[in-house]
Every structure is written in structure tokens, then in C-alpha cells.
Amino acid sequence: MMTPGGSGRLRPLPTAMYAGYSGTASSWVAKTSVSASGKRIQREMAELNIDPPPDCSAGPKGDNLYHWIATIIGPSGTPYEGGIFFLDIIFPSDYPFKPPKLVFKTRIYHCNVDTAGDLSVNILRDSWSPALTITKVLQAIRSIFLKPEPYSPALPVIARLYLTDREKHDEVAKEWTLRFAK
């Protein structure tokens, strides 16, 4: 970009004044503005940093605002006690109108988490509302460590064991926690 110089010649503008500009007004807006979903995610990130839920943390992976990594510490008194569980959080471009996708990266023996790490919890499906936040989602996921939802399982075989032989279920869940989450 050029500006008129004192001698009638054009001189270049300082680079910082047009960083991100590629020649059209629309490209300037695309590179310098944050979408409504991005602003919402930034606000939730700030709130999460100020007041995180118990045993939970989360934040962007690198500089991608729409891809986060979360950590949940297994609550005491559960077969997951002391385990460190990592999750990927992917926010859709139309967040919060669509729920984020959460995937366990740490293997876990749980009826609401399938073998690929995908969760089967109502808050991320039928119960989703734009009023919910990532803090509420993390709290809901932590709550399934305390009280699994065996009647809406991702893995029915684990749900069946949970309902019919809780002691054996908890023994296997503890073994997995020691093996994969410590």
C-alpha cells in the first residue's frame, strides 16, 4: 500500500499498518476479526482460567482456538482415582449452537466411553443448549467418573458388568487406570 509523499511520489506505508491485508476489504476482515464463536470460546477460556472445575483443566492446543486439550484427574473414591485423563476438545465453527466434540485420548474402562474415546453423554447430544459452557461440559464428564450412565452406554458390555457385578467392573477399571492413566 502506498500513501502520497511530500514530493508527489507515493511512499510505502509501514508494514505493521497493513499486516494481514491481502488486497481486498473482505480478506482484511477475515484475517483480523474474531468470529462470534471465537469470541465465545475466548470468553469461556478466560472464565475457565479464573474458576476451573475441580480436578479439570483445559486450553487451546497451540494457537488453534477451536482445538483444545483437557485434563481430568480421576476423583478419589472411584476406580479412576488419581488417573490423569486427557481429552481433545474440538469446537465447531457454529459453537455454541452445536456442541463441542470431546474424545478421550487416554484409554479408559467406562461404559460411557467407546474404544475410540468417543463419549456417550446426554449433555453432548440431546441435552445440548447454547447456554452450556465448556466448564459445564467438563463438570458433566467428571460426574460420569463418579456416577456412570449405564442406561445410555457407549459400550453395553461394560454397562452390563457395571450393573451385574460392580466389584468386578471396578477392579477392571482400576487396572486400566493404573495401566493407561498413571
From Swiss-Prot:
Keyword Nucleus: yes
Record annotation: effect of changing T78I: In COP10-4; induces an open cotyledon phenotype due to defects in photomorphogenic repression
Keywords annotated in UniProt: Nucleus, Phytochrome signaling pathway, Ubl conjugation pathway
Single GO cellular component term: nucleus
Molecular-function annotations in GO: ubiquitin-protein transferase activity
SMART domains documented for this protein: UBCc
Tissues and organs where the protein is expressed, per its UniProt entry: Expressed in flower, leaf, stem and seedling. Expressed at lower level in root.
Single Gene Ontology BP annotation: regulation of photomorphogenesis
Highest rank taxon of the organism: Eukaryota
Residue ranges of domain UBC core in the record: 36-182
Annotated InterPro entries: UBQ-conjugat_E2_core, UBQ-conjugating_enzyme/RWD
Subcellular location: Nucleus
PANTHER family: UBIQUITIN-CONJUGATING ENZYME E2 (PTHR24068)
Function (record text): Component of light signal transduction machinery. Involved in repression of photomorphogenesis in darkness by participating in the CDD complex, a complex probably required to regulate the activity of ubiquitin conjugating enzymes (E2s). Repression of photomorphogenesis is probably mediated by ubiquitination and subsequent degradation of photomorphogenesis-promoting factors such as HY5, HYH and LAF1. Although strongly related to ubiquitin-conjugating enzyme, it has no catalytic activity by itself due to the absence of the conserved Cys active site at position 120.
Quaternary structure annotation from Swiss-Prot or TrEMBL: Component of the CDD complex, at least composed of COP10, DET1 and DDB1A. Interacts with E3 ubiquitin ligase COP1. Interacts with E2 ubiquitin conjugating UBC5. Interacts with CSN3, CSN4 and CSN8 subunits of the COP9 complex.
Family: Belongs to the ubiquitin-conjugating enzyme family.
Descriptive protein name: Constitutive photomorphogenesis protein 10
Organism: Arabidopsis thaliana (Mouse-ear cress)
